[in-house]
């Protein structure tokens, strides 16, 4: 248990907070009305909460379309004419938070609130570093929100490289991000770099190169 006086996030959730979320909807046949309804219902039920972790979301998307566990609805990767497509959509940059940045104390010296990569100040069993820093060159002794973003960006870059090497077609979309904001511009660049090359379109700025499958959606 944490030391007496350690602050916790306020709200109605108890120790099981975030552990009772709705399971991911598996691949669903949308060639029939029932399948379409199932997907739309799942989308309508989604609610945003907490920080932004793009690599975690993309990783689960990859798992859903794969033919292996924990999801088994995907066709075999070796099947001809079978494209594995993952669409990565986000409205912000990767974020991970120190307790103090959210108004909490950190008497347990966890260095971050608990999220998908665990605590930033605790080594996960079997790892030489806290999981958020594992397999990156990012400093594992800089416990700041900005450094956590760098670590997540590094995780995202590695994931994108591995996904495309495995044959996934990666489409990326940012929502209302601004190139004039340095943090948002960095996320836009990361998303563009993650996206696959178009098989048909050319880069409007250089016709010798394929266009990237990245879009920044703007407007209300």
Regions found by a protein language model. Give the residues of each.
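P/S/T/G-enriched low-complexity
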Residues: 1-220
């Amino acid at each position: 248990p944490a030391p007496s006086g350690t602050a916790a996030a306020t709200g109605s959730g108890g120790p099981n907070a975030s552990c009772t979320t709705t399971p991911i909807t598996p691949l669903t046949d949308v060639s029939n009305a029932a399948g379409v309804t199932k997907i739309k219902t799942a989308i309508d039920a989604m609610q945003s909460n907490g920080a932004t972790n793009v690599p975690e979301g993309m990783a689960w998307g990859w798992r859903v379309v794969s033919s292996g566990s924990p999801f088994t609805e995907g066709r075999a990767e070796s099947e001809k004419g079978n494209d594995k497509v993952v669409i990565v959509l986000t409205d912000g940059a990767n974020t991970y938070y120190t307790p103090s940045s959210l108004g909490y104390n950190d008497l347990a010296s966890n260095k971050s609130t608990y999220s998908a990569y665990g605590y930033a100040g605790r080594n996960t069993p079997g790892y030489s570093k806290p999981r958020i820093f594992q397999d990156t060159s990012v400093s594992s002794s800089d416990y700041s929100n900005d450094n956590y973003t760098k670590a997540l960006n590094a995780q995202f870059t590695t994931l994108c490289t591995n996904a495309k090497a495995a044959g996934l077609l990666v489409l990326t979309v940012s929502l209302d991000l601004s190139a004039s904001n340095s943090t948002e511009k960095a996320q836009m660049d990361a998303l563009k770099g993650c996206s696959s090359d178009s098989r048909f379109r050319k880069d409007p700025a250089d016709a010798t190169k394929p266009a990237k499958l990245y879009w920044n959606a703007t407007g209300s």
